């Protein structure tokens, strides 16, 4: 097929392929696009790839303008979870899929979408025809000609934004928007990036496992894998980013917990480079003889990174499209004439733009439009332990607590979770960290008399422990809304909030999801996960919550 006549009139040309295979067909398509002087500015390819871990995988590409999403799921499930407008479908050898996929193909088809197919059954051709596809005589080519009007594409936003917050959430937002050609102003009250919750010496990056593969597990898996790929594009761990992919060993809490983990290992067929269950002898051998009484999970590709260095790498990648307004103190936010305007305590305008992204953690509660969001500030204290006071570890070790290998003669241990608003180091929190460290190492004398040293940060946490990613809801205008898509939103106001202790992992993919959504691109996550992260979920939950006793008349 000659794609050139199809993509020359589109700003983005999206292809869905039911078989990635060895990638050769995708490379041919990309080569054709690259060499066409009349090509669309952007080529987005979505393909099924069964050998990957379950879910959606956004694969960063060196080629500007090319996006590749690989999905590990059955065809019907993948299409049902896809948020996209597809211009071309390539369906290969799907006769075993039945006919349910046809309605999902029609749902994501763009106006005048085309279809190439091999091996369709008569029932599948009939199902696609019933959904609005008109086939050629050969039964292998079709065009979407549904009489149902396609939902109008959202208007192209003006590509200027303010990002409030220069921590891990804000830096990721700036980098993902600048990568799309946006002009971004990052505003922060501190004089340097990553001076608040993102300022720890070390953050742990690792996946999450669960028996039921629940929402936090699926989100964290997708975000972890995206982060590893994206960080390589930024220069890599140990190079542009300070840290080490030394691996993480997560010990089982007790014998019962170990049995649950063995069941996960037996049922998931996880690749060893992603996660491997180690029994006690293997775990203790890895730790050089330290106790690991109930075994644990080894995440070989995981490790630690200094969040501030990740922020710096992302902000540096923005180039000349980024303006930094740091050290401005607290700001006042107003909407005026289609613009968001930030002014400092002296009434001087710091920045203005049609789009504002709140990435300032618990500080979002001070913004009137975000104040109804049920966000909580939780204090976390990390202890800095002299390296000669604890065993030298080849990996990050964690259970209820964590301990990193040494960096600069210091190991990080922690961290506490409490509601104390005091930003000063607390001897009680330090003692709590050391007590849990001794339990982790099975050594009652580890780090004995370690001096009070460390850092305090404040996490922003949502009631469901999931992040808030997307356009912020207007609680006052919500009325009797029952569906997420119908919730009224504040114009040009977005949130990247509620990262709790997983900002290092969640930030990159969350920012990519936000930027893709603003631009009207195919989304990098399943729609069920997108909905689970939508800030407007709390509007619906507030409506559905049981009311207390009503006063009698």
Where in this protein do the model-derived segments appear?
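Dinucleotide-binding Rossmann-like beta1-alpha1 core, especially the glycine-rich loop
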Residues: 202-286
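A short glycine-rich, Lys/Arg-flanked "PGG" loop and its adjoining helix->strand segment in the class I
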Residues: 99-111
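S-adenosyl-L-methionine
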Residues: 51-81
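Helical element adjacent to the flavin cofactor pocket in flavoenzyme catalytic cores
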Residues: 297-346, 350-355, 359-360, 364
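C-terminal catalytic lobe of FAD-dependent flavoproteins
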Residues: 449-553
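Active-site substrate-recognition segment that forms the wall
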Residues: 140, 148-180, 189-190, 194-209, ...
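SAM cofactor-binding core of SAM-dependent methyltransferases
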Residues: 2-58
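Helix-loop-beta segment of a Rossmann-like dinucleotide-binding subdomain
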Residues: 211-212, 240-250, 274, 280-318, ...
């Amino acid at each position: 097929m000659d794609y050139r006549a199809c993509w020359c009139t589109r700003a983005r040309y999206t292809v869905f392929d039911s078989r990635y295979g060895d990638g050769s067909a995708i490379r041919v398509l990309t080569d054709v696009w690259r060499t066409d002087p009349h090509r669309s500015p952007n080529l987005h390819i979505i393909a099924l790839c069964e050998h990957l871990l379950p879910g959606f995988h956004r694969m960063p590409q060196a080629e500007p303008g090319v996006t590749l999403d690989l999905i590990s799921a059955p065809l019907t499930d993948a299409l049902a979870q896809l948020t996209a407008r597809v211009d071309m479908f390539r369906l290969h050898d799907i006769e075993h899929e039945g006919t349910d996929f046809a309605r999902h193909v029609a749902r994501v088809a763009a106006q005048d979408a085309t279809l190439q197919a091999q091996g369709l059954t008569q029932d599948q051709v009939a199902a696609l025809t019933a959904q609005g596809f008109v086939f050629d005589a050969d039964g292998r080519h079709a065009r979407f000609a549904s009489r149902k009007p396609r939902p109008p594409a959202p208007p192209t936003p003006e590509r200027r934004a303010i990002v409030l917050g220069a921590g891990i959430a804000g830096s990721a937002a700036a980098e993902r928007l600048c990568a799309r050609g946006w002009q971004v102003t990052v505003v922060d009250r501190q004089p340097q990036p990553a001076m608040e919750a993102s300022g720890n010496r070390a953050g742990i990056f690792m996946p999450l496992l669960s028996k039921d593969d629940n929402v936090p597990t699926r989100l964290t898996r997708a975000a972890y894998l995206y982060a590893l790929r994206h960080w390589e594009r930024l220069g890599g761990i140990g190079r542009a980013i300070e840290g080490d992919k030394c691996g993480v060993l997560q010990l089982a809490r007790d014998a019962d917990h170990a049995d649950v983990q063995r069941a996960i290992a037996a049922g998931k067929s996880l690749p060893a480079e992603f996660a491997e269950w180690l029994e006690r002898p293997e775990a203790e051998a890895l730790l050089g003889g330290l106790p690991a009484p109930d075994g644990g999970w080894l995440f070989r590709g995981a490790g630690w990174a200094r969040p501030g260095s990740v922020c710096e790498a992302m902000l540096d990648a923005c180039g000349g499209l980024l303006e930094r307004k740091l050290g401005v103190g607290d700001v006042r936010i107003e909407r005026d004439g289609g613009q968001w305007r930030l002014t400092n305590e002296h009434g001087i305008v710091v920045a203005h733009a049609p789009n504002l992204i709140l990435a300032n953690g618990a500080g979002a509660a001070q913004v009137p439009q975000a104040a109804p969001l049920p966000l909580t500030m939780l204090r976390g204290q990390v202890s800095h332990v002299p390296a000669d006071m604890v065993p030298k570890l080849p990996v990050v070790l964690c259970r209820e607590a964590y301990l990193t290998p040494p960096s600069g003669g210091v190991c990080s241990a922690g961290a506490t979770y409490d509601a104390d608003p005091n930003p000063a180091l607390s001897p009680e929190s330090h003692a709590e960290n050391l007590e849990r460290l001794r339990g982790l190492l099975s050594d009652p004398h580890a780090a004995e008399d370690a001096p009070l040293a460390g850092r305090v940060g404040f996490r922003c946490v949502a009631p469901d422990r999931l992040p808030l990613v997307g356009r912020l809801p207007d609680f006052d205008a919500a009325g009797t809304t029952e569906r997420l898509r119908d919730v009224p939103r504040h114009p040009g106001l977005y949130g990247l909030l509620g990262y709790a202790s997983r900002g290092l992992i969640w930030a990159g993919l969350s920012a990519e999801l936000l930027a893709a959504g603003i631009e009207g691109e195919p989304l990098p996550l399943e729609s069920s996960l997108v909905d689970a992260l939508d800030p407007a979920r709390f509007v619906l939950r507030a409506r559905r919550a049981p009311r207390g006793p009503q006063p009698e008349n």
